[in-house]
Each structure stands twice: as C-alpha cells, then as structure tokens.
Amino acid sequence: MTITISAPIGSGKSALAELLSDLLETPVFYEPVSQEENPILPLYYSDQEKYGFLLQIFFLNRRFNDIKNAYKTNNAIIDSSIYTDSIFLNRLYKDGKVTKEEFDVYHALFDNMMEEIEGLPYKKAPDLMIGINISAETELYRIGKRGREFEQDENLIQYYKNLLDDYNEWFESYDISPKLVIPGDDYDFVNNSYDKFVVLSKIVDKLQEIGTLTGDDLKKVRTKLSDII
C-alpha cells in the first residue's frame, strides 16, 4: 500500500504524513527541503529563472526514487507527489522563468518515467492520493509561521497564490488513482485531538472503501484511532 499526500505549500502535508505514519506504522518518504538534502531550494527562491529547471529535475529524480523505495518497503507514505511537481514547472513556464525547450524536455522526461510498463513489479500511481484544501490566507499564514527564511520574500506572495490556484485545478482533474480531499481550513489536525481523529478516520474509511486496509490490520488501526480522543 502506497499513500501519497499532495498539497499546497504550507498545508500541513508533512505533519499529516507523520500522523499517518504513526497510525499505520509505515515509513514516510519526506520531501527534501533542508539545506543538507536540497541545496538547490534556497537558490531557487533567490533566482527562479536560473535555478527553476534544475530544481524541478532534482525533485523529479528524487520523487521517482521514492516511488521505487516505497515499493520495496511494501507499505509507505510519500510526502509530496511526483505528479504535482509539474504544477511548479508549468507555473515557471507561465511566468516566463523557464524556456519552451526546458518545458518540453521536462514533460518528455516525466511522461517517459511515469509510463506504466506491463510486467513491472511495481506500479507508479499510489493506492490513494490525499489532498489538503486550504485558502490563500491559511497558506500565507502558515508559510510565515514556519519561518523558512528563503520563503519569506513579499515578492513571492502572488507566486504562492498562483500555485494554490494551479494545485486546486490539478487536483480536481486528477483521476489516476482513488483520491481524498481534506478541508485544511476546517480541521487543525496538528493541535486539536478531535480534528486529528476526524481527519485520520476519513482516511481510514477511504482505505477500507478501496480495499487496501482490511482484516486484522483494519481492526488494529481502528483501535488506535479510538485512543486519540
């Protein structure tokens, strides 16, 4: 079973991944955002035109590696989706920050990497895609609250809003696997125990519905859920 959490910047996807990991007792493949793991990210925020294509190729390679490693662990949660990386590349292209040639190369590479091949021991689409829907106000508040210095430039505000719109449009049309959307403005699943219970219950219900969580595993998870509140 592979679960992917795909959500806008500042939505709480890493926090939700950690909660799910504890509940399902599965490892998480986190998005590389630290200076040590991803030295390109702060450079990108200082010069999107220079580093935009390079950053997206870095993420594409990392996400594909996560998919393969997730298969090896049998059950896993992936924090951030390879499918949504194209949202960032497309936004850069719309904003004139990457060239038509870079745009075409990226999408040709992505399509080639993500083509499902008959007989391959793993599939590339997740069993469940989880989205978190938040408002622009919530997004900007949380970006400011978490305090990553390279994200705080006021000139990035419109960029964040555009990405949020792009993400919502993408998630609405996503149909490669079952999906579930969490209303992130309505539930504080990080600090409120009841909200945490509700959100995790929604996810467990969906996993049961699609047949990836059954039998004794399902009973064990339901018992752990009841202990939250």
Spans of features found by a protein language model:
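P-loop (Walker A) phosphate-binding loop of NTP-binding proteins
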Residues: P8
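NTP-dependent small-molecule kinase module
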Residues: G144-I229
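Hydrophobic positions on the alpha1 helix immediately C-terminal to the Walker A/P-loop
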Residues: L16, L20
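Hydrophobic anchor at the beta1->P-loop junction of P-loop NTPases
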Residues: I5
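Pre-Walker A (Motif I) flank of P-loop NTPase domains
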Residues: M1-T2
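A glycine- and Lys/Arg-enriched "phosphate-lid" helix/loop adjacent to the NTP-binding pocket
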Residues: F88-D165
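Conserved substrate/cofactor phosphate-moiety recognition/catalytic segment
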Residues: D22-R62, F88-L89
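Conserved lysine of the Walker
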Residues: K13
